[in-house]
Amino acid sequence: MGKIIGIDLGTTNSCLAIMDGKTAKVIENAEGHRTTPSVVAYTDSGEILVGQAAKRQAVTNPDNTFFAIKRLIGRKYDDKAVQEDIKKKVPYAVIKADNGDAWVATKEGKKMAPPQVSAEVLRKMKKTAEDYLGEPVTEAVITVPAYFNDSQRQATKDAGKIAGLEVKRIINEPTAAALAYGVDSKKGEQTVAVYDLGGGTFDISIIEIADVDGDNQIEVLSTNGDTFLGGEDFDLALMNYLIDEFKKEQGIDLHNDKLALQRVREAAEKAKVELSSAQQTDVNLPYITADATGPKHLNIKVTRAKFESLVSDLVMRSLEPCKKALEDAGLSKSDITEVLLVGGQTRMPLVQEKVKEFFGKEPRKDVNPDEAVAVGAAIQGGVLSGDVKDILLLDVTPLSLGIETMGGVMTKLIERNTTIPTKKSQVFSTAEDNQPAVTIHVLQGEREMASANKSLGRFDLADIPPAPRGMPQIEVTFDIDANGILNVSAKDKATGKEQNIVIKSSSGLSEEDIEKMVQDAEANAEADKKFHDLVTARNTADNLIHSSRKAIQELGDKVTAAEKEKIEEACKELEAATKGDDKQAIEAKTKALEEAFAPIAQKAYAEQAQAAVAQGGAKAEEPKKEEDVVDADFEDVEDDKK
């Protein structure tokens, strides 16, 4: 059985870890970095760039560079949160798919589901793991924000499938961080608050770590959060400030200039990072735009105090879920023994200060906020494969689950923060006399009104025997697996007839859609390999042409005119082949040049060998002239007179 890798699929950055013996190890990507930007770009030449390479060209290719896709995954286009993101001027197109989901589109009009784009990031992670391990990788544990709903979890699993990974478990990010901390911690029973402020999402989980019969038991008591609050919002606040200041100075609004907007976005992110350690920074963007009077430059000084005033409401927004999580766990702030900070945005001093004020204790600084989640995912992978023993993980469902009942009310079957896996049943009946069928409308959320909650799916239980209203007994069962993914069944107790629904297409993608995307991905991988092989063949050919011509020049008169002509002809034919896309033709002409040059190389080598032998013979005679030379040991003697 191969390794089960751990992947933190982040909004801004992603991270990969594997179990190396008894410890989890973060693996560097091909560029030598421990995290990979969650950015995917589609170039004019048809190449797909992922990570740093995609991020680097974002300014010149804003329409086809996709970032923060995690904020769209498993969401409907008409969701208020999605509409707000579109208003925030993401440079790429967000469109409404036929099924109502939020998809993205390239400037050429190619439509893609968010799981399809995220799969490119996962594929890079998979390749990194395979390069490190030297063996195929087919299984993974992938993390999601604790507050992700069923659709978002399923869409994440779909992304894994498209990337060629069997997702063995979906695990909540704060839980993974606690797992990473809990495995290293040997302090007995602890109640830990995991404050996870990442690039696009915020989670707070209250977790109990205890030693139960020698096992390290990690139990989630409660979780809460906001799936539209993260570092991207902090960047946006600073970006809008810079654009507003520039407009005041120059009278030009950069909001409608995609290239300028992308430059300001990147500068805002860089300034935000600098202000975590410096009191002020200069944002300097020369030639940001131009008008009739000439080019314009953006040069604005930003102090830490100014930046904190711009984002203080975002930081305060994160504290409300903290209160709710404590209430749901039935605990007070004084019951918390440790506070863990996870996610890159927690490096901001204001965030650390407000978390310290809220919980009344200093947050721990020994947990790497960028890597802890991936490490926890790798440990969970180790647990599932049997490589890691003595760990018991008890997670919870973040949102209540139920069905719509008479009057448009949501009746909850499973309350939020219920430990999973779990199974609950409840008996319902008909609303009218002789009702032949009932529609089971499955909902997720906390509102009383059914329409205000997230609809996960509908199905009908038909052929109910005629009976007065309230008489038939319809047993509805909700079954949540360890990934937090739901199965619902309805059974007529009188007839035994049963109907069920696995809420597996709530991501909006059918099995056929996913299979097509898997095939597209495989085709792309094949195309990428062909492109790579073609470039390798061209490079080999170019090197051979260069070395052949150089050798002919150096050998000079030792090569006949006929030989020179033959080599030059072969070089020209190979040059012509490298301008085309036929790898086999390039390789054939490369072989022809090698064969043409081989006799010359052999002749040159033989002449060099003869010269070396002759020179060696002369040198061998030289020592005979100095037969009176005596070998002696020398001893260094310090000169005291120095």
From Swiss-Prot:
Residues 614-642 are annotated as: Disordered. Induction: By stress conditions e.g. heat shock. Coiled coil: none annotated. The keyword NADP does not apply. Keywords: ATP-binding, Chaperone, Nucleotide-binding, Phosphoprotein, Stress response. The keyword GTP-binding does not apply. InterPro entries: ATPase_NBD (IPR043129), Chaperone_DnaK (IPR012725), Heat_shock_70_CS (IPR018181), HSP70_C_sf (IPR029048), HSP70_peptide-bd_sf (IPR029047), Hsp_70_fam (IPR013126). Acts as a chaperone. Belongs to the heat shock protein 70 family. NCBIfam families: PRK00290.1, PRK05183.1, prok_dnaK. PANTHER family: HEAT SHOCK PROTEIN 70KDA (PTHR19375). This is Chaperone protein DnaK. The lineage of its organism: Bacteria, Pseudomonadati, Pseudomonadota, Gammaproteobacteria, Thiotrichales.
